[in-house]
Amino acid sequence: MPNKKEAWKEGMYGDEVREKLLEFAEEGWESIPEDERDMWFSRFKFWGVFHHRSGQESYFMMRLANTNGVLEPGQLRAIGEVARDYADGPVENPEFGDTWIDLTTRQSIQLHWLKLEDIPEIWEKLEAVGVSSRSAGGDTMRNISGCPVAGRDKHEFVDSQPVLDEISTKLRGDDSLASMPRKFNISVTGCREGCAQDSINGIGLEPAAKAVDSRDVRGFNVRVGGGLGGREPRRARSLDVFVEPDRAYDVVRAFVELYFDNGNRENRQKNRSRFFVDEWGTERIRDLLQREYVDFELRRAGRNLREEYTYNAGRPAEAGKHDHVGVHEQTDGRYYVGLSVPVGRLTATETIELADLADEHGSGAVRLTRRQNPLVVDVPEDEVDALLDAELLETHRPEPSVFTRGAMACTGTEFCSLALTETKARMAVMLRWLRANVELPDDVSQIKLHYSGCTADCGQAMTADIGFQGMRARKNGEMVEALDVGVGGGIGAEPSFVEWIRQRVPADEVPGLLRNLLEAFAAHREAGQTFRQWVDATGEESLVEFAEPEETDYEDPCLTDAKQSWYPFDDGESPAPTDARGEPISADD
């Protein structure tokens, strides 16, 4: 029997939801019947509109959809202006202030504290420059990820941008496929670094070559059934298919349709595509695709480039960082400059400043990476130094510290109904403490620190050198925010997921744990050994011993909140719900 969300989707989903959302926006928050709010909030997600967590009633988040992290000239500025004019909540975050944007791990952008009544104006402003929020959430195909410098990468193996554009336009734009069994992630990359992380997507196209009719043809191998979340991660498995670029869309569509037709619509705990691949197996899937979903012969897999992957691969410094941060030459002789934005949060002012810099020193275009960082592209060589001297780059540096460079964090309890802990402000404070209190050998260039507020793992803790997932614990008789700590994750040629070595560590003891663990790494590693290599070579018992929790002078920003307040940094009474002007709505209104 289908679950209730399937019943809701059968009643209305996809493009038709937009008109109803606009109707509610015109009539105001209170026009949504209270006993129907869960249903409408679930439907709104298709249009990237998410209601905030309990205690923040009438406030919404909007997630945008920009395939492959592409922001054309004028788009980032419009987003920054929307954040400035509309993303202003009733309280300030003590770490970030108010009016900001969040860069995501799928190369998109999220705006918070939006009022339902403002959404029509917000859509009008964004859509005027070609920015949409359609298909950015819910049970649908999410933002398609890829190499952010596709078509510009000097060392690119095959240009994936045309494939990405075709999939986005024809597949994600197809309303008949809007209601998938569950959210579905697609990645396509033609680069040699593996930065699109094909291993953790529902379907991923990776660069490959194959001899076809005595020609060495470049194209893609196909992997299916990858993903994180629920402490049940899966590596995407080879479908044993090689596809040329002009057939790539057809193969992706075929697998999407197969999952659409046959995916589990009853048990939401077991209906992600990774479980579908578990149940069916790649041989059966390949056979059915060939017989019923494509009208051309599926070739066997070609030679992949996985051994070259360096993106979050735990490889030595001499292999390169390949996270797109820093100054890099493009194929046309111009350059792109990648900024490091800790935890992916830019103020509205910084966002507009970044758009100014892109206009002044580049083509105006900006790209977003899967590490929550922006790239200014198309910078002539004689403009690079001027860009590097810009004040904004003193804050978001192209050559950041080891810890800052590797940090990512999800939304956390600030807004998310699933999260158990605050994430972004805590990570920012921890990064400052680590920079001041932990020294690493000169040849250690990266430590990936990923923080997810719950086991859904939107912050990709499972693929970190050191991953954190939010929990709760008791300390001195009081409920506090706590973290599970895992080590040894990564992507690369052979993806691995963290081993959880400490559970429910009070958040104020985690920095001390990190210092103890990293000092042990520095003391016991072999020359040139990366953290991931050291973890692989060190027994679990020793790792647990090294990772001893410890209280230090670190002051946690919201240790005792444990989601007991309406906002992690305000234990007063919630002002929500509010009207279109942000004024509280009384029970008598």
Question: Which residue stretches match the model-derived regions?
Answer:
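Peripheral terminal and linker regions in Fe-S/redox and tRNA-modifying enzymes
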Residues: 1-589
